């Protein structure tokens, strides 16, 4: 809806209270952390850094970091996924496009693909928002495993406890 009046005091902060049950915002000053312990290992040379683990709406946002070339995984998304490539590049075997540094990718619901990091890429970091579940599948669609926001939270708790940050370190990212 277009503005009906002119805001004559645009630099005055909002003066009313926020809704009583509104969740706190998440502010992460350094999304790509210096502390290696913040990265949660997912496989050899593959880790993620949680940004928002939204258990009430069933999605997660994270940085995916891959420090190897080759096939990462084949998976299906029943819901939409958004990605922003921060470092390096990658592609899917099923498509002829390449996701490059600075590029944005929308993955439509129902998409199944095989993520590959090229041989000449030392490090790839992509920010992903994954909605719902990610199903790991074989080439013929048979489900071999899954991830959702709850498995992500569990992985974080176990890792952060192990590296000395404490299992509750993940709580700052959970909404």
Give a label for each model feature:
Residues 90-114:
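Short acidic-glycine-tyrosine-enriched beta hairpin
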Residues 79-80, 141-151:
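Short intrinsically disordered coil segments
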Residues 1-58, 143, 154-157, 161-175:
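A short, N-terminal "cap"/entry segment at the start of jelly-roll beta-barrel domains
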Residues 58-67, 72-74:
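Small beta-barrel nucleic-acid-binding modules, principally OB-folds
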């Amino acid at each position: 809806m277009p503005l009906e009046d002119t805001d004559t005091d645009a630099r005055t902060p909002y003066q009313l209270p926020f809704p009583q049950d509104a969740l706190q915002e998440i502010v992460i000053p350094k999304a790509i952390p210096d502390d290696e312990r913040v990265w949660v290992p997912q496989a050899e040379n593959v880790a993620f850094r949680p940004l928002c683990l939204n258990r009430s709406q069933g999605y997660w946002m994270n940085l995916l970091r891959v420090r190897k070339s080759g096939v990462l995984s084949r998976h299906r998304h029943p819901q939409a996924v958004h990605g922003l490539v921060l470092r390096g590049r990658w592609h899917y075997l099923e498509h002829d496009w390449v996701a490059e540094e600075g590029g944005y990718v929308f993955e439509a619901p129902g998409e199944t693909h095989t993520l590959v990091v090229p041989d000449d890429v030392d490090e790839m970091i992509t920010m992903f928002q994954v909605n719902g579940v990610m199903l790991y599948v074989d080439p013929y669609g048979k489900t071999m495993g899954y991830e959702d926001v709850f498995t992500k939270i569990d992985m974080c708790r176990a890792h952060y406890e192990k590296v000395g940050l404490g299992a509750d370190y993940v709580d700052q990212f959970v909404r």
